[in-house]
Amino acid sequence: SACSSQGGSRPGTLTLWTHSAGGTDEYAVIETIANDFNAANPGTKIQITAFPQAGYNDSIVTAAAAHELPDILDLDGPIMPNWAWSGYLAQLDLPASLTDAMVDSAKGYFNGALYSVGPYDTSLCFLARRSAFQAAGIAVPTIARPWTRDEFDAALKRLSELPDYEFAVDMSVWDTAEWWPYAYAPMLQSFGGDIIDRDTLTTADGFLNGSDAVAFGTWFRSLFADGLASQTPGTDGTDFLQGKVPMVYAGGWKVLKAQETFGADEVLILPPVDFGRGAKVGGGSWQWAVSASSKNRETATRFIEFLMQDDYLVMYSDAIGTYPSIESAIPGTENYGAGKPLEPVYEIGKAYALLRPATPGYKVISSVVDKALHDIVSGADVRKTLDQAVKDIDADIRANDGYRPE
């Protein structure tokens, strides 16, 4: 069914597009849910088309231009406001009993209306070797009491002095695309800066280039300049798994592999650092939506509601290591719940998740912030780089009339 298109759909057929290319664990879950829905609704058929993630957003934009969007589609949380603003998506009419039970970071609101919901979310954390912390005499921070900046800096210095490791920490700068804004903007926000004025969504001036933002950029650059972190770590977090570094900043989806490698007791799952304005991590992951052009909106919405049942949220979690977006599903999962291996990842997300700003301009903000941070790590002047980033973001907002609803 991967080559089926919207054009050939028969009556009673709903088309569904997903970023989970065929053969992946997530695809298998979606297929199971679709088959169950088809069985429960004779006369209705969900027809799945799967895309590789890399080209998925482009496929949606192209289909929208040709008026060939599917009935049901998944989307990465931060892109939703742009697609809602562009008229691709229908508002979702879901029962309050469902939406009230969901974590906030899995609900996609734009201009006060709900457009997408996600079966899961995940979180960021520091993973560290317990033995290294013991050798360096470092106290372990807790979710209730995360590191301060001074404590974190002191811990990095001590870890860097251990003879067994090349660097103190892998900050995962090998990763690309949405990773840099997702992973490092929360640190900027903890310093007191931001990537845009969240209240008005009309400017980045004073937020991305104020004194707090400059302090963040200077500190971030120093990690690499002072030799605490590598500018060229191995891809995919291999430095930590190979014992080259005692700590890595990573997504919750990296925890199981680390526990398999070193044993669960040796792997500390640590919260983000409180740089002054509270600890923060990125929130929001893949979510489901209905296209505005769908002639089967009601059935499409029913499918999304069907997919959000606890049993399926458990299935998603067990397949891909994310946590369910509804608390009642958590005890049924392999990895989440009291005493289970990924429980701290959920607690960190619940305590500290900050959504990326819900503006149609986020796509541009994301790429501008990504470039600015890369330049800063490479040694560019922090203030000048951030001033230029603000100019670029504000110019885009102006060029789109402030992204007001059309």
What are these regions (language model features)?
Residues F110, Y115-P119, L124, D150-A204, ...:
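Extracytoplasmic/periplasmic solute-binding protein
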Residues V29, R130, E305-E327:
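Periplasmic-binding protein-like
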Residues D318-K371, G402-E406:
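Long, aromatic- and glycine/proline-rich binding clefts that accommodate carbohydrate-like moieties
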Residues S1-P81, Y88, F275-R277, E298-T299, ...:
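Conserved N-terminal structural module of periplasmic/extracytoplasmic solute-binding proteins
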Residues A50-S59, P78, P146-E151, S230-Q242:
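Short helix-initiation/N-cap motifs at beta->coil->alpha
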Residues D153-R158, R198-Q231:
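Glycine-centered hinge/linker elements that transmit conformational signals in sensory
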